[in-house]
Amino acid sequence: MCSPPPYPPQGHHYPPSPHGSYYSPTPYGAAPSPPQSSSPHPRGYHSPSPSWGQLPPRPPQEAQSFGGGAPSNYRFQYSACTGRRKALLIGINYIGQPNQLRGCINDVANVSRYLNERCRYRREDMVILTDDQENPLSIPTKNNILRAMQWLVKDAQPNDSLFIHFSGHGGRTPDLDGDEEDGYDDVIYPVDYRTAGHIVDDEMHAIMVRPLRPGVRLTAIFDSCHSGTALDLPYVYSTQGVLKEPNLAKEAAMDLFSAISSYGQGDLTGMAKTAIGFFKKAAIGDSARQRTVMTKTSPADVVMFSGSKDTQTSADTFQDGEARGALSWAFVKTLQERPHQSYLQLLNSIRAELEGKYTQKPQLSCSHPLDVNLLFVM
């Protein structure tokens, strides 16, 4: 099959990539390729879900078609994750600030240990930013985070495996470019956000997703509030493995119920505002998703697990005698117990760990249509 066309570069004005030995990992030798299972259906949405006693099939290595909704000449490539490994781990407790957290630095320590001991990520190929360090380059300021994100993806080659983990405060800001169905962009807060400002999902997508070549894997774990679309990945999957679509019918019922309630209370202004808001949302919802799909797809293999939906908060938890982020803890725990899971099994395992303890619902999203019954690799 012919090679996919190069992804069109789009300029952005962010800080230059980090330089110096601190951000210069040594070369990582390619690991031996594991035996390949038979390739699933190219799109794979209806391939049978593997049982717990059955090893899920590995990702196919031929170029895949995006299908409906994406530019017709685009193809994407799954990564075998046999090449170089690099990781960026960010944990911010906001020490000494009014909104201080407790578990984020612990999250980074636990995730880095897991990557090193179980996933063959070398310490010298990790950049760790936490706000308890003395080295100014290791503090998770806005500038350091942006520079480290550029370091992470610099010179990435097909079958490389990149990993980013963020544990800290997240939030929402009004969307300015029309690519969000709910009218808000997701943001993360650096330790110096009060003076430097937040980092928007559009910005992170431009730095870490847009430049990647076909076959490069970026695995992202965002353990923060309102993190559902923190990388602006257009394909979102439910626990049944189906592609999620905006549920305007459900939202219509909720908004019209609010309008009826306003009328019953004699609040005609409230009724008018609610009705207008619904019809505006119905009009832009589909176009916002189409804009996201058309502009935020990627031929690379980008997969993200986020701590909550866009509208939800994420919780700290207390496990094994220390504070931790709920998603960070559940992600490591489920993979340590069952390392060979499909994407769908992993999402359900994470949700099962949190169910009954927290209201948040971790999300799975991807830069391309994903066969969720394939083996999760990174």
Swiss-Prot record:
The keyword Hydrolase applies. Residues 1-70 are annotated as: Disordered. InterPro entries: Caspase-like_dom_sf (IPR029030), Metacaspase (IPR050452), Pept_C14_caspase (IPR011600). The active site is at H169, C225. GO terms for biological process: apoptotic process; proteolysis. Involved in cell death (apoptosis). This is Metacaspase-1B.
